[in-house]
Amino acid sequence: LALLGCQATATEPAKAKPAAKPQAPSIPIHQAAYKGSADVIRQHLAAGTPVDTTNQYGSTPLHYAARSGKADAAKLLIASRAKVNLKDSKEITPLHLAASGGHTKVVALLLANGADYKITCGERKEPALFAAVNKNRAKVVALLLSKGADVNAKDAFAETALDSAVGKGLPEMVALLAKNGAKVNGGGGTSPLHKAASTGQKEIVEILIANKAKVNITIAFGDTPLDWANRNGKKDIAAILKKHGGKTGEELESGN
């Protein structure tokens, strides 16, 4: 029998402690993305770090994974709903960074997940094709063209990727672009052949002529590529042009 004045009490179950919220790692998520540290990225995301968080440069983790060519990190970020077409403070997208770096696998991954190769970036408003051409990334150029990138797209200065390749002295890139439909006679203004002739780029001159560039194409004031070669003292280029029927503007005007 229970003692007078005492009551039997049931033992109350202990309350479960709430699970501790995961803590973000000390390594910044942008650094983890650049190094391809997938586990660190996962820890950040589990701790609530936004997948598209930006740093002082306006860059997201995906920008950094694209820049360094870390495909696994890029894949994880994209699977976590990273926006593939965001621009950083310099107006650059992850696709441009991957294309410039020659990271074909990351370029393919971005394109497969909605990256837009038509978006223009930087001061010159260049599409992704230019980023690859400027760094002589032939495999990336071929991939972009195979996915529908316009080989004759123009930047803010009305120049094409072919103009850029000629300007940077990249004969193999000139050949690749010409093979894929680049307009070898240009679209107004200075022609690619004028540029190559005036700067003494023998191999590029020969490639352009082999791809049906007009030897006697004229621009402002009736100047031909031969005029520009002569004016800049490029005797070897002048000889090549003459071999293919090249004439000066004056000769064309006089009918000689």
What is each PLM-predicted segment?
Residues 37-45, 70-78, 103-111, 137-145, ...:
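Ankyrin repeat structural motif
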